[in-house]
């Protein structure tokens, strides 16, 4: 009886560990579930006019972020999530969240794309402009 309890406990612990730390398998799982890896994940309504700072941010985004997060931050299936999404509204992911993610990387916690690495060679100032660009896109899409 004691032996069965030990075996059951080990199986339960192993199952919990698998559920709690799935990040290692996420990239493979997502890639196998995605037929068109570069597909746009959301339609983005563009604002009629971007501020000067947002235009600077757009250029920086295109150079440092778009290869993963897609054109106009629309995301790419199997690669990275859209930033024009309610999850990234300012009340949930404030501006400092973007600063920290770009500087330090971030562990996957909303999406199944795996962890985001730190962005090499980008300054805090450039990220500030990128945030301005993302926030203006978000507002044009009803995310406040």
For each feature predicted by the language model, list its residue ranges.
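C-terminal capping alpha-helices of c-type cytochrome domains
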Residues: 2-5, 11, 15-24, 118-144
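Histidine/glycine-enriched, metal-chelating micro-motifs
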Residues: 8, 75
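Extracellular/periplasmic low-complexity linear segments
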Residues: 26-27, 92
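Electrostatic cytochrome c docking/interface patches
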Residues: 29-60
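Sequence/structural segment immediately N-terminal to covalent heme-attachment motifs in c-type
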Residues: 50-74, 93, 97-104
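Activation segment of ePK-like protein kinases, specifically the conserved APE
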Residues: 73, 106, 138-142
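Short cysteine/histidine-rich zinc-coordinating motifs and their immediately flanking basic loops
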Residues: 77-82
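Extracytoplasmic electron-transfer domains, predominantly the class I c-type cytochrome c fold
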Residues: 84-137
């Amino acid at each position: 009886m004691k032996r069965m309890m030990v075996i059951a406990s080990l199986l339960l612990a192993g199952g919990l560990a698998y559920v709690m730390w799935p990040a290692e398998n996420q990239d493979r799982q997502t890639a196998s579930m995605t037929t068109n890896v570069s597909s746009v994940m959301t339609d983005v309504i563009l604002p009629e006019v971007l501020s000067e700072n947002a235009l600077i941010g757009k250029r920086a985004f295109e150079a440092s972020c778009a290869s993963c997060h897609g054109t106009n931050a629309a995301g790419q299936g199997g690669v990275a999530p859209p930033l024009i999404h309610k999850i990234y509204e300012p009340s949930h992911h404030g501006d400092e969240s973007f600063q920290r993610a770009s500087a330090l990387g971030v562990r996957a916690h909303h999406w199944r794309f795996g962890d985001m690495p730190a962005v090499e060679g980008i300054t805090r100032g450039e990220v500030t402009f990128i945030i301005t660009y993302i926030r203006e896109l978000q507002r044009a899409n009803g995310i406040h």
